[in-house]
Curated annotation (Swiss-Prot):
InterPro entries on file: DUF167 (IPR003746), YggU-like_sf (IPR036591)
NCBIfam families according to UniProt: DUF167 family protein, PRK01530.1
Organism expressing this protein natively: Rickettsia africae (strain ESF-5)
Gene Ontology cellular component list: cytoplasm
Record-stated family: Belongs to the UPF0235 family.
Name of protein: UPF0235 protein RAF_ORF1191
Pfam families with a match to the protein in the record: DUF167
Length: 105
């Protein structure tokens, strides 16, 4: 099984894979899900998936949850799909591992 993220140490950037469930009761990252043998972090978002509202809430939630600037978080794949690839810029690998380990149960 592959990892759900890739880290580039020269650019201090990470690509993370998420399975997003919009229109949820709360914003929450809850462990992993495997789809076609590919791992994804599960992300529930309160916003509805209309006119980019859920995508905007994803960025806001991750920025607040991980104490990052919104400008360092970008959805680069899956804008209209529940499977998303998100780019995190200017992140230290140790801090990324700390974040990741908090979701491994």
């Amino acid at each position: 099984m592959d990892k759900f993220y890739n880290y580039n140490s020269s650019s201090h950037q990470a690509l993370l894979s998420f399975k997003v469930k919009p229109n949820s009761k709360q914003n929450l990252i809850s462990n992993f899900v495997i789809i076609n043998n590919i791992p994804y972090l599960k992300l529930s978002i309160k916003a509805i998936p209309e006119q980019g509202k859920a995508n905007e809430e994803i960025i806001n939630y991750l920025a607040k949850e991980w104490k990052l600037s919104r400008s360092n978080i970008e959805i680069i794949k899956g804008h209209t799909h529940s499977l998303k690839t998100i780019l995190i810029k200017n992140i230290n690998e140790d801090y990324l591992n700390l974040i990741i380990n908090s979701y491994i149960k």
